[in-house]
């Protein structure tokens, strides 16, 4: 499982602070929906009919116990007590209040998690087999390759505005 280092933590914290300011400006009417849309999509936030939806990255589908606890805490405090795991091994919160999203992102950062590039037309979360690294019939552990792709593509300016979303799985 990937472990954040000081660089990762600082990058995610800076992104959380930036999005918190962008959200404040949007709610104050200083940013239009057209201006806010690409900013929220870069941070995993969709506007749906009934409420916003926040998608959280789970790199290669691996969670530690303390990360799962953090997700449960977020679901209890900011949503309806549950999240939805996706086929891409992410988790979605379907009922957060827009004004709470910056706090959710800050809580995720404390658990070494984020929502960067989980929506919009970019390279999405890289997935692998849920038994990667322990399967008896595995020829090679795909997780190091997933991590190389994740580091290479995350926040890469050439992949921020693709014509469509791009999904990668390494088996």
Which residue ranges define each predicted feature?
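Iron-sulfur (Fe-S) cluster-binding modules
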Residues: 1-54, 66, 70, 74, ...
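Small-residue-enriched alpha-helical segments and adjacent helix-cap loops
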Residues: 27-31, 51-171
């Amino acid at each position: 499982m990937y472990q954040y280092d000081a660089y990762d933590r600082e990058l995610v914290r800076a992104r959380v602070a930036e999005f918190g300011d962008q959200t404040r400006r949007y709610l104050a009417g200083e940013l239009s929906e057209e201006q806010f849309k690409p900013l929220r999509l870069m941070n995993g936030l969709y506007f749906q009919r009934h409420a916003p939806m926040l998608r959280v990255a789970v790199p290669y589908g691996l969670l530690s116990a303390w990360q799962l606890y953090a997700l449960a805490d977020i679901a209890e405090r900011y949503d309806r007590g549950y999240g939805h795991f996706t086929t891409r091994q992410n988790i979605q919160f379907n009922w957060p209040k827009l004004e709470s999203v910056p706090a959710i992102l800050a809580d995720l950062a404390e658990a070494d998690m984020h929502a960067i590039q989980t929506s919009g037309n970019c390279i999405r979360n890289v997935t692998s087999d849920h038994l990667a690294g322990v399967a008896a019939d595995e020829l090679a552990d795909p997780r190091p390759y997933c991590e190389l792709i994740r580091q290479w593509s995350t926040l890469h300016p050439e992949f921020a505005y693709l014509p469509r979303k791009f999904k990668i799985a390494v088996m």
